[in-house]
A protein has these predicted regions:
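Short, low-complexity disordered leader/linker segments with a strong preference
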Residues: 1-35
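Short, well-ordered beta-strand elements
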Residues: 31-43, 61-67, 134-135
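Beta->alpha turn/N-cap motifs
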Residues: 43, 69-71, 81-95, 112, ...
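Short helix-initiation/N-cap motifs at beta->coil->alpha
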Residues: 65-76, 164-191
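Ligand-binding "clamshell"
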Residues: 96-108, 122-123, 195, 200, ...
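A conserved helix-loop-strand patch within extracytoplasmic ligand-binding domains
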Residues: 108-157
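Periplasmic-binding protein-like
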Residues: 110-119, 207-244, 248, 262
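Ligand-binding clefts/hinges and TM-proximal coupling segments of bilobed small-molecule sensing domains
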Residues: 141-166, 248-262
Length: 262
């Protein structure tokens, strides 16, 4: 698989906030909005949020980026009201969090493209993966299933029909190379490459760890894969609350601004 065609979408993130075109820096009640906190995982998600924060500052909006090192805490912080938005996850992950925690988080927009890929320090294709190799995948429900689905698309395993990104190890119906599937916290996956043959790694951790997509990656999710598209999330109660929430001003102005991360 050639990776050059993926370089632009991987390294250029576009996060559209409706703040361009604002005539002033006050909300509809005539008050200057207080500090708005947006949660993001370290790496490209936080970089995009920081770039947006600079643009928001021009509109009189104090957007503070709160960085997290794991996948679960940003949603907990949002559900608890400690932050007002977060930008780091795909819809299935958010929906699973809602189901597991009885929360009501909703997506209000798309942010950046973050494909998961298969990475290795020793092999360059699925065909090169040796018999009995240890293969690492994320240990959270949706991204773990996403990793298994990617292994299936690469032809390394076969899964039960229809399971998709909801797959678990129990859904593997064929494993011709007798791969040993090891589930690890997503943030640990880049470091695991010294100990495993292949790891299915989300792109934000690929970039934050400084992995080389072209040299270490050999199979990537397609650009139109729904779970590769990240979202901007808020609490359901705040979704349309432009007048009473300080961050409503972010979405109440005409136009949008695109932030490029290279």
């Amino acid at each position: 698989m050639k990776f050059k065609k993926f370089i632009a979408p991987l390294l250029v993130g576009v996060l559209a906030f409706a703040i361009a075109g604002c005539g002033n820096n006050t909300n509809q009640a005539g008050q200057t909005p207080k500090e708005v906190k947006i949660g993001a995982t370290a790496g490209p998600h936080a970089q995009v949020a920081e770039a947006v924060a600079k643009e928001a500052k021009k509109q009189g909006i104090d957007l503070k980026v709160v960085e997290f090192s794991d996948y679960v805490t940003p949603d907990k912080a949002l559900a608890d009201g400690d932050i007002q938005l977060n930008a780091y996850q795909h819809v299935p992950f958010m929906e699973n969090f809602n189901k597991q925690n009885g929360s009501k988080l909703v997506a209000i927009g798309k942010t950046i493209l973050m494909p998961m890929g298969l990475y290795s320090n020793s092999v360059r294709s699925a065909a090169d993966v040796p018999e009995g190799s240890i293969v690492a995948i994320p240990n959270d429900p949706t991204n773990g299933g996403r990793g298994l689905a990617l292994l299936a698309k690469a032809g390394l395993i076969t899964l039960k029909d229809g399971v998709g990104f909801k797959a678990t190890v129990a859904d593997i119906t064929s494993n011709p190379k007798n791969l040993q599937i090891q589930e690890l916290e997503a943030a640990q996956l880049p470091r695991s490459l010294d100990d495993v043959v292949v790891a299915a790694i989300p792109m934000n951790y690929v970039q934050s760890a400084g992995l080389n997509v072209e040299k270490q990656g050999f199979f990537l999710e397609p650009k139109d894969e729904p779970v590769a598209v990240m979202i901007l999330a808020v609490r359901e109660q705040d979704k349309d609350n432009e007048k009473r929430t300080p961050y409503g001003v972010l979405f109440s102005c005409k136009g949008s601004v695109s932030i490029n991360i290279k």
